[in-house]
């Protein structure tokens, strides 16, 4: 089935404590639109003692809007996690403005896909604060899709598929951008 969330899945906006349990399995889809979001809270925020993040199967978590500030857009610092499958998809729905999706994850994710579609619908996934571990594949889908390591280490246990045909070179050019000369991608 599909769950459409117009806003965010997060803690109460007035406190930093609180815990959520997020479990997604099989071929389910969760779409977080991020409409009228509080920018100081992530679109999906799983953190604190007692929080759980589980993702498996061929499930898909799609983030439509970026723009989160304090905690980014995907803030995964769950106390407990089991990640054996699933894809996190940074793909807007034809909003008409480029979107940057900030990812701060202390827990691993399985697959990450960055999927823009036109110059007006460019999608950039950007790592913030903590090293990112991707247990499966990182897919940079097309010329309007960018992944930025932002100078933070990225560990990809599966494949890196970069379909961005840009011939630009450098730490801040092309489809995969390390962000610094000391950033480590393994």
Say what each PLM segment does.
Residues 1-186:
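Extracellular beta-sheet-rich ligand-binding/adhesion modules
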């Amino acid at each position: 089935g599909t769950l459409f969330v117009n806003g965010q899945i997060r803690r109460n906006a007035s406190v930093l404590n609180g815990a959520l349990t997020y479990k997604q399995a099989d071929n389910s889809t969760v779409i977080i639109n991020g409409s009228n979001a509080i920018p100081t809270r992530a679109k999906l925020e799983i953190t604190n003692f007692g929080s759980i993040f589980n993702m498996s199967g061929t499930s898909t978590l799609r983030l439509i809007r970026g723009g989160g500030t304090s905690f980014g857009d995907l803030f995964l610092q769950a106390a407990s996690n089991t990640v054996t499958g699933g894809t996190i998809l940074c793909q807007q729905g034809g909003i008409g403005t480029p979107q940057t999706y900030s990812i701060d994850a202390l827990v691993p994710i399985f697959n990450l896909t960055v999927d823009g579609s036109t110059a007006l619908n460019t999608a950039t996934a950007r790592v913030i604060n903590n090293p990112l571990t991707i247990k499966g594949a990182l897919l940079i889908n097309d010329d309007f899709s960018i992944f930025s390591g932002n100078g933070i280490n990225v560990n990809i246990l599966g494949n890196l598929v970069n379909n961005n045909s840009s011939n630009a070179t450098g730490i801040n050019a092309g489809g995969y951008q390390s962000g610094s000369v000391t950033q480590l991608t393994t």
